[in-house]
């Protein structure tokens, strides 16, 4: 098992912790949802971003900050 963080974990530590715990993320267009990026936990949708981003990098940065803000707001 790898013990040192990889490139993704360095760039997006909150997303990495989120999906390694019990949450998951969705990235991409979905006919039933307007947001391009979304964060979920077992209770349902906890955060969603905008409909469009200039780049995937932009979407991931917003997702990183969105999950971090949600965690702080809910005292997790």
Where are these regions (language model features)?
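Short N-terminal "domain-start" leader segments
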Residues: 1-34
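Short acidic, gly/pro-rich beta-turn/loop elements at beta-sheet edges
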Residues: 37, 47, 75
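A generic structural motif
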Residues: 38-42
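A short, exposed loop/beta-hairpin motif centered on an aromatic-Gly-Thr core
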Residues: 44-58
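Short arginine-rich
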Residues: 65-76
